[in-house]
C-alpha cells in the first residue's frame, strides 16, 4: 500500500506495478501498456496484464472488464482515479491481491488484457504470502459467495 501512497504524493497520472518475479520477454510489452492508456485515457482505475483466474463481466474497448481477478503480478493504475478507492483496501483483512474485488464492488473500473506473449512469471520459488481456499473448494469471492469457481477463466 506504500506504493499507492508514493504515487499519490508524486502526483503521477499512471503507474505500472511489476512484482519481482515478472520477467519481460519482449519490450513490446511497454507499447502494449501504452496502447491501453491511449485507448482508455481517464476511463479506468486498473488494468491487469496477468492473472491466475478472473470472473469476466464484458468486453469494452478491446479489454475485458472483470468482476473479480486474482494475482497482481503486473498491472496499470490510473493514479488520480484510484485515490477515491484507496480507502476500500482497508482494513487489510484479505490478501492484497484479493482486495481488488472490494474496489470493484464500490464501482472501480477494472480490466484485464492478456500479456503472456510479452512477459512470463518466474515460479522458481513459492509464494511468500500463502493462499487459502477458505475451507470451501468452490468458493472464491466474498463479493460473490454463491457463485462457483466454474465461472472463472484461468489465466497463466
Spans of model-derived segments:
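An acidic/histidine-cluster motif and surrounding catalytic segment
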Residues: 1-18, 22-156
